Amino acid sequence: MALSMDNIVISNEEEIYMMKAMHIPCGLYLNMVLRAAIELDLFEIIAKSTTQKLSSYEIASQIPTKNPNASSLVLERILRFLASQSFLTCNITKNDDGNVHTSYNLTPLSQSLISDKDGSSLAPFLLLHSESVVVNSCFLLKDAILQGEVPFNKAYGMNAFEYTKKDSRMNGLFNKAMQNVTCIEMKKIVECYNGFEGVKETIDVGGGLGISLASIISKYPNIKGINFDLPHVIKDAPTYEGIEHVGGDMLKSVPQGELIILKEILHNWDDEDCVKILKNCWRALPNDGKVVVIEQIQPEYPETNLLSKHLFALDISMMIMFHGGKERTKQQFEDLAKQAGFTSIKVMARAYYYWVIEFYKY
C-alpha cells in the first residue's frame, strides 16, 4: 500500500513551526524549477496537447534532448515537484497488465504561465526576476543596512535604468516582462475602473512600449494617447492606432494633457524625485485635470494574508533595485500629493495587487 502524506496529522505546534523552518531553504528551488520549465516550454507543451495529459516521456520527446528515455527520468522528478507545488496535477492509473501510467496536466496556477488569447503570460516576468543579473544583487542585500548602498548599484556600478540602457539583452527581457504583465493588469483595470470615460487625451508617463495606453484605447477608442518615455525605450515601441510615442525625461517635464497616467513609476523613485515627477504632472494638467496613479498600496501593519505578503516582498525588490525605491502606504501617497501641489487623492479601484488612485489638481 502506498504511503500518503495526506493521512499524516501533525498537531504539535512546535513540530509544525520547525518543519516550516526546515522548508524555508527549499524556496529557491521553486523559482529555479519554474524557470527551467518555462525555458523548456513544458507548460506550453502540455497546453497544446489534445488530451492535455502527458507523461514525462511524451513531454521529453517534444523537447530538444538527445535521449528522451534518460531525460524523461529526470523530467519525471521535475514534474512531481511541480505537482506538489500545485502547478500541475498528477494522474496515476494502472493498466490491465499491471503497469502504472503517470500523466500530468495544468492547473489554474500554471495557466498563468502559458500564453492567453492575447499572447500574454506571467512567464517573462518570472524569468526576469530569476535572471542572474537580478539574483546576484540579492547577495548584497546586507549592504543596504551596513553601508546604506543600493545592492544593484554596488553589484554593477550603475543603477538599474542605466544598466538596461547599456545591456540590450537585459533591456529586451525587461521590456518583454513588462509588456506581458502590463497587458494582464490593464485588462483587469479597464474592467473595474471607469475613470477614462469621456476623456479625450491621455498621457502615459513612463509608459514603456505603450501597452497600457493600447489597452485603454481598445475600450475607449475616442481617446488620443501619448506614450511618454525615455528615447531608448520608445524606439522599440510598436505602432498603435491613436497613440503617439514621445521621447523625454519625466524628471524634467511631461507633455500636457487632461489626464496623466503614472503606472508603477513612483515606487522606483525616492520621495524627492517622486515630488519632482508629480510637480511636472501638476504643471502639465488643466485646472480640472487629474493624475491616475496605479501602484501597490502597502498596508500600515505587516499582515500575513496574500496581499500583504506580496506587497512587502515587492518592497524588498524595490530596495534591492532602486535608490529610494519603495512601496508606499496611502498616507505616504497623500503626503507626496500635497508636496507636489495636489489638493487631494482618492483610491478608486483595485486590480490584483494594484490600486488605482486619482490625484486631483483642484
From Swiss-Prot:
The active site is at 267 (proton acceptor). It is an enzyme of class 2 (transferase). It comes from the Eukaryota. Mainly expressed in stem and petiole trichomes. Its EC number is 2.1.1.267. Flavonoid 3'-O-methyltransferase involved in the biosynthesis of polymethoxylated flavonoids natural products such as myricetin derivatives, aroma compounds possessing antioxidant properties and exhibiting pharmacological activities such as anti-carcinogen, anti-viral, anti-thrombotic, anti-diabetic, anti-atherosclerotic, and anti-inflammatory effects. Catalyzes S-adenosylmethionine-dependent regioselective 3'-O-methylation of flavonoids; active on various hydroxylated flavonoid substrates, including myricetin, thus producing 3'-methyl myricetin (laricitrin). This is Myricetin 3'-O-methyltransferase 4. It comes from Solanum lycopersicum.
